[in-house]
């Protein structure tokens, strides 16, 4: 099975996303995180299907999941998730503070 690793900031992003959505719908929050986990496994098996995001950093790729975007980099036998952000946010500012 392909590996999916998460940087601490990605873990924090997921907690923030779940907490925000769960205020209105804990079930909806659970479903979104399940979908992110499923897509992460797909990306780990085929890491180059995401869009190259060289403007954010070397080897960074992105993949949309609903209103969110998963940012990751391919690693040996999988991916490492860097961030999970809402698509309406200023992505470049968050990567280059």
Regions found by a protein language model. Give the residues of each.
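Basic, Lys/Arg-enriched alpha-helical interface segments
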Residues: 3-56, 60
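Absolute protein N-terminus
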Residues: 1-2, 97
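Short, low-complexity, polar/charged sequence segments that are solvent-exposed and flexible
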Residues: 23-26, 62, 82, 91
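Enriched for short, Lys/Arg-rich terminal
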Residues: 68, 73-97
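Basic/aromatic recognition patch in beta-strand/loop cores that engages polyanionic ligands
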Residues: 48-78
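Intrinsically disordered, low-complexity segments enriched in polar/charged small residues
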Residues: 8-11, 58, 66, 88-94
